Amino acid sequence: MQFLRLGLRVVGTRRYATPAGPTTSSVAINRVAPEATVGVREAVLWPGRPDMCRLAEDEQGLHLAATLGDDQVIGVISLFVDGAAARFRKFAVLEAHRSAGVGSRLLQAAESEAASAGAAHIECDARPQTAAYYEKRGYAAAGPPFAKYEGSEQLYATMRKPLA
C-alpha cells in the first residue's frame, strides 16, 4: 500500500462517537492544519491540479484528517460553519482505504462538529456518482444539478442533511 507521508501538524484532538469496526480501529480522526489536507485532496479530487486543492477560506475552516499511525493521512474533510448552516468541502479518502468505513467516520465527525457549533443542517456539493453515498447517510438533494466551475461539463448537486 502506498501512503501519503506528511509532516502532520495536529492542531487538536477530540474523540468522536463513531463506530470503529475491525478495519477502522487503527484509524484516528484529528483536527489538523489546512496544509495537512492538500496531499489527499490532490491525489483523489484534482490529480495534477494543486491550484484546485487549496481554498481561499481554508484558514476559517475546521479540517479533519483520518490517519494511520502518526503521519499517514488517508482521508480528509474540511468543514465551514456559518450560523445555522454548515458546509463541508474537499472530502476525500485514498482509494486503497475506501469501503472500509474511513469516509463514514470522517463524515460523522464533521457532522458532530457542525452540530456542536450550532448548525441546523449540513450540506455539500456532490458529483452525481456520489449521490447514493450521501442519500444512504440521510442527505437529500436540495436543488437541481449545476455546473460548479466555468468551462467544466461536470455537474454537481447540493446534498443537505438536517442535524438533530
What is each residue range found by the language model?
Residues V38-V73:
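Active-site rim helix/loop that mediates acceptor-substrate recognition in acyltransferases
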Residues T24-V38:
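A short beta-loop-alpha structural element at the N-terminal edge
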Residues E123-D125, A140-T158:
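Conserved catalytic-core motifs of GNAT/GCN5-like acyltransferases
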Residues A65, Q72-F80, A85-A92:
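Conserved beta-strand in the GNAT
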Residues F3, R41, Y134-E135, Y139:
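Conserved active-site tyrosine of GNAT-family acetyltransferases
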Residues E113-R127:
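Conserved GNAT acetyl-CoA-binding A-motif
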Residues M1-G21:
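N-terminal amphipathic/basic-hydrophobic helices that include classical n-h-c signal peptides
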Residues V93, S99-S112:
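Conserved acetyl-CoA-binding loop-helix of GNAT-fold acetyltransferases
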